[in-house]
Amino acid sequence: MLIKLLTKVFGSSNDRTLRRMRKAVEQINKMEPDFVKLSDDELKAKTIEFRARLEKGEELEALIPEAFATVREASKRVFGMRHFDVQLLGGMVLNDRCIAEMRTGEGKTLTATLPAYLNALSGKGVHVVTVNDYLAQRDAENNRALFEFLGLSIGINLPGLPAPAKREAYAADITYGTNNEYGFDYLRDNMAFSPEERVQRKLNYALVDEVDSILIDEARTPLIISGPAEDSSELYIKVNKIIPNLIRQEKEDSDSFQGEGHFSVDEKARQVHLTERGLVAVEELMVSEGIMAEGESLYSPGNIMMMHHVTAALRAHVLFTRDVDYIVKDGEVIIVDEHTGRTMQGRRWSDGLHQAVEAKEGVDIQNENQTLASITFQNYFRLYNKLAGMTGTADTEAFEFSSIYKLDTIVIPTNRPMVRKDLPDLVYMTEMEKIGAIIEDIRERTANGQPVLVGTISIEKSEVVSQELTRAGVKHEVLNAKFHAREADIVSQAGQPGAVTIATNMAGRGTDIVLGGSWQAEIAALEDASAEQIDAIKAAWKIRHDAVLASGGLHIIGTERHESRRIDNQLRGRSGRQGDHGSSRFYLSMEDALMRIFASDRVTNMMRKLGMKPGEAIEHPWVTKAIANAQRKVESRNFDIRKQLLEYDDVANDQRRAIYSQRNELLDVSDVSETIASIREDVYKTTIDSYIPPQSMEEMWDVAGLQERLSNDFDLTLPIADWLVAEPNLHEETLRERIMQQAQEQYQRKEEVVGVEMMRSFEKGVMLQTLDSLWKEHLAAMDYLRQGIHLRGYAQKDPKQEYKRESFAMFAAMLESLKYEVVSTLSKVQVRMPEEVEQMEEQRRQESERLAQQQQLSHVDAETEAAQSLAEQSGERKVGRNDPCPCGSGKKYKQCHGRLA
């Protein structure tokens, strides 16, 4: 109550920010008459003037009024469109490292031209980020004329472009592309073997369109570049045969492990667990199928991967449904985005889940992959010097934007008042009662010529509604992942009088629904339309537009509530654009997933008390409040999952940044001989110390072991025992110096044969390849650590702190291994002629290019860790008894962790 009172007196933070910015808007409006008088050449010259002022030290913010006035005037001349005052406000918010919430139809694309132009003046680059390639190309082409009029260059970053074309796109003042492609280019740049292979500049300013979709919905989705791991498709097929024999536990009680069935399902967490009976049943079935030997256990050390396959197969059968979570097209399992309803070509679930679904559907099983490089969108976008975003629905996620990305959300007022009527939810007892009511509502409204948009949350539900409409004789269009090719066309005509469009999660974001249909689309369909034809089309559209307004505007029907209020708001936001009339209503049933899992008992009891009869609907503020609370519960849980994922990924991110920084420094220098000499001395010292401890007596020396190690690992054959016999007074320090001198001389002989320049190139290549190889193994080890770290909680230890501590120790050990491997490789390598070295380098480059193309987006669903399937650890060098312990202690393996083995 007190907060509301204070807000009323002083205004909210949002109000105060807009009040401050309105002063700048007034300033821009005062400048407008002066800018109108400028010739085209004088207006274009403003860009040169602004850049000169920035070079002299003027702040970017000081240019806002003049720069925005320049863009507004240029837009009027190029597009015939003038930025509204609210769009100027939006532009300032976006320049101010904030998120601008702008309603559908308020012109976000035109608003983005303001901060994009301003920040491009610095010459450091602007990245406009969109959710798909179509929008990236569309927005770039639509705005190209404006930016080129003002003297700025435009680049489009698309998948599959060759490196020179990508480099050119990134060198442009403003680059358009998708979040995936920007992220992949960052990872590829950090796998490059020469500075010329890199394409990105330093990350300066990112302007993210549909920011909620990219920074919230995609936050659990790591970007991964991967290579093939071992083939285990036969095992997936065998395990898949077992699952149909298992029985689901009927009652999900607290002690699910002791239950009657073979497995229990937790729908809230989307997890499935074997019961004690289930474990026994699975073991018996695996023995009968010949997968396991008689008497073996699933939890035997050798069968750990079996358990991984069983869990993946169970989840595939129980939690993932065809035409809801994925579709099967041309013998391929393609994931359906739960937030947009679009198919996600090229994405694969991790942890063997995708292979398990492929086995379930009987299609070809693709190999599991091993991660070579990965990053989450959360950590990628935080690399930018300046980040901003815009969307129609951000206010419900304002806390998350603030806490994770340090971005404030500012709600921009609409240019015209919103007059859409949002009707209360109607709740029915059963699914069929609800669908019957929806069909009746559609028939009544279309009879009056009112267009209707029906939003469903899955392809399966959209097809059920479509079948019922067909049965009722109602003509309609269906827009879901199966028919996405006609998306823009269907959405553009969804505002025709009496039109009925069924859309899955409103997949048509980016295309406005215009009341009366799109006259631009009609004109575009004609070849060389005459002026008379254009006038006739516009006149016909005006009649249709007025008829739709008279019928009440576009009516939105939601067939059930989504887990997130934001997705519901996106659906509602399709109606009532630019002050148009419209209405919306959600129809729910007690059989809906959200109601069944999160709100069932309370609402069902409430409905019984209110005396519900079959076919009747309840419309009550209590029910609406209960549903809103259920959505908040889910949103809160999903936020916790994303936050926890980020906390763990932050640990890996610190290490990633250190490795990539070191790698880039290495790429940018041509001579690493000093570094090699330093680590060679360090490695030899550590090796000698493990056999001849400093300040020790000669009886403690393991001379034979040292000779063997130097010969095996460094190709350095030295008669150390003979030296000690010939020189009984040979001091420990003198012996060390002699060994180091022999190693140095051996290395110089190799350098003389191959040539100094070729040796420098070879040293650099070995360092890069060894670093990449060990980093890949380190990523796998980090994933394994992450998967089991929660068990530390049972020992009263904080899993996050344990993860930080152990991952740091692993990182330190990796750096020690890096030094050892580099020196060992350079010492043992057989010297070849320069031509052979160049040929090997070319083969290496071709192989790295092939691997870089094997990229995938590992889609991690809300309930699984962001851990990838990384089984390939067999290439690891076996640690000898006299080798330095991998923990980095400096002791022999047999005297350190070897004892534990």
Swiss-Prot record:
It is a peripheral membrane protein. GO terms for molecular function: ATP binding; metal ion binding; protein-exporting ATPase activity. It is found in: Cell inner membrane; Cytoplasm. It comes from the Bacteria. The keyword Ribosomal protein does not apply. Its main location: membrane. Keywords: ATP-binding, Cell inner membrane, Cell membrane, Cytoplasm, Membrane, Metal-binding, Nucleotide-binding, Protein transport, Translocase, Translocation, Transport, Zinc. The keyword Cell cycle does not apply. It is an enzyme of class 7 (translocase). ATP binds at Q87, G105, E106, G107, K108, T109, D512. Gene3D superfamilies: Helical scaffold and wing domains of SecA, P-loop containing nucleotide triphosphate hydrolases, SecA, preprotein cross-linking domain. Induction: Repressed under conditions of excess protein secretion capacity and derepressed when protein secretion becomes limiting. This is regulated by SecM. GO terms for cellular component: cell envelope Sec protein transport complex; cytosol; plasma membrane. PANTHER family: CHLOROPLAST PROTEIN-TRANSPORTING ATPASE, SECA INNER MEMBRANE COMPONENT OF SEC PROTEIN SECRETION SYSTEM. Belongs to the SecA family. Monomer and homodimer. Part of the essential Sec protein translocation apparatus which comprises SecA, SecYEG and auxiliary proteins SecDF-YajC and YidC. Part of the Sec protein translocase complex. Interacts with the SecYEG preprotein conducting channel. Has a central role in coupling the hydrolysis of ATP to the transfer of proteins into and across the cell membrane, serving both as a receptor for the preprotein-SecB complex and as an ATP-driven molecular motor driving the stepwise translocation of polypeptide chains across the membrane. This is Protein translocase subunit SecA. It comes from Erwinia tasmaniensis (strain DSM 17950 / CFBP 7177 / CIP 109463 / NCPPB 4357 / Et1/99).
